[in-house]
């Protein structure tokens, strides 16, 4: 979903950047507050940022949509550090990719953050916690977080392209066309990301349950480690 420089009209670039900015400001405030409470937190957020950067650096071109498909990693990030911090790590990952890898653009950064960091993160976070409250185990909830986060990201990207490029035509028709262009690549990638997210959480639960407990993802019984 890395929209290239010049894909969107400048007016829509300004709109998406204005939309993303308050989320980034809130995330920075929350990071400062959380770091004061727990010195472990900021380095862990940095680790997650590196993971999101690496995961989202595996593009599959989608020429008919003017962008590319790839796993995002924001579903897993949102489960571990919350959706607000995921917005921040997404900004860092996307900015580095745009500046040094020509992957995405600077004017389209707000649109990319809105899709991957906002829509993807919050959708995955709420899907995970809704599944857990409904009685789903960690694997199932993690799978749903990964899948819904990934697909929400690309649905929002399709919306951004439809709004920016439909011109006098139908936004709905443009959205449908772009969304369908993503299906051959993003349907399997979304399922793969669900498995990856579930597997990562299961691995942490088996090897480092203290991390999940510290991040309030799961609660250990008193005396457990």
UniProtKB/Swiss-Prot annotation:
<keyword id="KW-0472">Membrane</keyword>
<keyword id="KW-0997">Cell inner membrane</keyword>
<keyword id="KW-0170">Cobalt</keyword>
<protein>
    <recommendedName>
        <fullName>Cobalt transport protein CbiM</fullName>
    </recommendedName>
</protein>
<keyword id="KW-1133">Transmembrane helix</keyword>
<dbReference type="GO" id="GO:0009236">
    <property type="term" value="P:cobalamin biosynthetic process"/>
</dbReference>
<keyword id="KW-0169">Cobalamin biosynthesis</keyword>
<keyword id="KW-1003">Cell membrane</keyword>
<comment type="subunit">
    <text>Forms an energy-coupling factor (ECF) transporter complex composed of an ATP-binding protein (A component, CbiO), a transmembrane protein (T component, CbiQ) and 2 possible substrate-capture proteins (S components, CbiM and CbiN) of unknown stoichimetry.</text>
</comment>
<dbReference type="InterPro" id="IPR018024">
    <property type="entry name" value="CbiM"/>
</dbReference>
<feature type="transmembrane region" description="Helical">
    <location>
        <begin position="143"/>
        <end position="163"/>
    </location>
</feature>
<feature type="transmembrane region" description="Helical">
    <location>
        <begin position="175"/>
        <end position="195"/>
    </location>
</feature>
<feature type="transmembrane region" description="Helical">
    <location>
        <begin position="108"/>
        <end position="128"/>
    </location>
</feature>
<dbReference type="GO" id="GO:0043190">
    <property type="term" value="C:ATP-binding cassette (ABC) transporter complex"/>
</dbReference>
<keyword id="KW-0171">Cobalt transport</keyword>
<comment type="function">
    <text>Part of the energy-coupling factor (ECF) transporter complex CbiMNOQ involved in cobalt import.</text>
</comment>
<feature type="transmembrane region" description="Helical">
    <location>
        <begin position="7"/>
        <end position="27"/>
    </location>
</feature>
<keyword id="KW-0812">Transmembrane</keyword>
<feature type="transmembrane region" description="Helical">
    <location>
        <begin position="76"/>
        <end position="96"/>
    </location>
</feature>
<keyword id="KW-0813">Transport</keyword>
<dbReference type="GO" id="GO:0015087">
    <property type="term" value="F:cobalt ion transmembrane transporter activity"/>
</dbReference>
<comment type="pathway">
    <text>Cofactor biosynthesis; adenosylcobalamin biosynthesis.</text>
</comment>
<feature type="transmembrane region" description="Helical">
    <location>
        <begin position="43"/>
        <end position="63"/>
    </location>
</feature>
<keyword id="KW-0406">Ion transport</keyword>
<comment type="similarity">
    <text>Belongs to the CbiM family.</text>
</comment>
<dbReference type="InterPro" id="IPR002751">
    <property type="entry name" value="CbiM/NikMN"/>
</dbReference>
<dbReference type="Pfam" id="PF01891">
    <property type="entry name" value="CbiM"/>
</dbReference>
């Amino acid at each position: 979903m890395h929209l290239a420089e010049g894909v969107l009209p400048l007016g829509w670039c300004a709109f998406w950047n204005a939309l993303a900015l308050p989320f980034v400001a809130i995330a920075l405030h929350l990071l400062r507050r959380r770091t004061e409470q727990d010195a472990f937190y900021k380095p862990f957020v940095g680790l997650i940022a590196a993971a999101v950067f690496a995961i989202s650096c595996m593009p599959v071109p989608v020429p008919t949509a003017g962008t590319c498909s790839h796993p995002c990693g924001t579903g897993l990030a949102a489960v571990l550090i919350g959706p607000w911090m995921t917005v921040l790590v997404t900004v860092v990952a996307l900015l580095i990719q745009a500046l040094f890898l020509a992957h995405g653009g600077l004017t389209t950064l707000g649109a990319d953050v809105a899709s991957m960091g906002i829509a993807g993160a919050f959708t995955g976070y709420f899907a995970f916690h809704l599944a857990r409250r409904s009685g789903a185990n960690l694997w199932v909830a993690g799978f749903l977080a990964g899948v819904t986060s990934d697909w929400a990201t690309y649905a929002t990207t399709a919306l951004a392209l439809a709004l920016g490029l439909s011109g006098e035509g139908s936004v709905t028709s443009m959205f449908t066309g772009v969304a369908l262009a993503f299906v051959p690549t993003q349907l399997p990638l979304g399922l793969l990301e669900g498995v990856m997210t579930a597997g990562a959480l299961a691995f942490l639960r088996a090897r480092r349950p203290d991390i999940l407990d510290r991040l309030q993802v799961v609660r250990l019984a008193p005396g457990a480690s």
